[in-house]
């Protein structure tokens, strides 16, 4: 929807670019909403995780997607600075009762800093952290 600010997670990008992914259709259905957002944000950690995960299934698509993100003026890819990593490591260390990965914690830190609430993801970790997941997926997925 116009005016929205959306965080883009690996979960969504993988589902979108891997036709064999069980959430591919859901990701494709969400894509117009992402495209019409006023701002889309992700991180270098998400970009790296995405390319690594898609290297076997859609290397060319992953490369093209990343290049398109960098070329789009509405898209911001936040670098993983030492300060951001320190904040994320603190979240990671303090979340022993969760299964959050470091990339999740980097995402959560960026979302909090930028005042983002919506995430293009089906990852239940985002809901656990208090954000809105734009894709419905059972907690045990991925």
Predicted regions and their residues:
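Acidic, PIN/NYN-like endoribonuclease modules and their adjacent C-terminal/linker elements
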Residues: 1-5, 108, 114-142
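Short, well-structured N-terminal submotif of metal-dependent ribonuclease cores
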Residues: 1-42, 55-66, 140-142
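Short secondary-structure boundary segments
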Residues: 44-46, 104, 123-124
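A general structural signal for well-ordered alpha-helical segments in protein cores
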Residues: 47, 62-66, 85
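Short acidic, glycine/proline-enriched helix-loop-strand junctions
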Residues: 69-81, 89, 95-97, 126-142
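Active-site neighborhoods of divalent-metal-dependent phosphate/nucleic-acid chemistry enzymes
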Residues: 75-118
């Amino acid at each position: 929807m116009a005016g929205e600010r959306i965080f883009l997670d690996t979960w969504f990008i993988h589902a979108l670019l891997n036709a064999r992914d069980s959430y591919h259709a859901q990701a494709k259905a969400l894509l117009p909403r992402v495209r019409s957002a006023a701002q889309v944000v992700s991180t270098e950690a998400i970009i790296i995780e995405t390319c690594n995960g898609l290297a076997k299934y859609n290397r060319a698509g992953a490369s093209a997607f990343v290049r398109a993100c960098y070329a789009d003026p509405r898209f911001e890819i936040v670098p993983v600075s030492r300060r951001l990593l320190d904040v994320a490591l603190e979240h990671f260390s303090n979340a022993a009762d969760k299964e959050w990965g470091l990339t999740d914690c980097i995402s959560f830190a960026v979302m909090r800093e930028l005042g983002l609430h919506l995430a293009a993801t089906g990852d239940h970790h985002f809901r656990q952290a208090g954000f809105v997941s734009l894709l419905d997926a059972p907690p045990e997925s991925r």
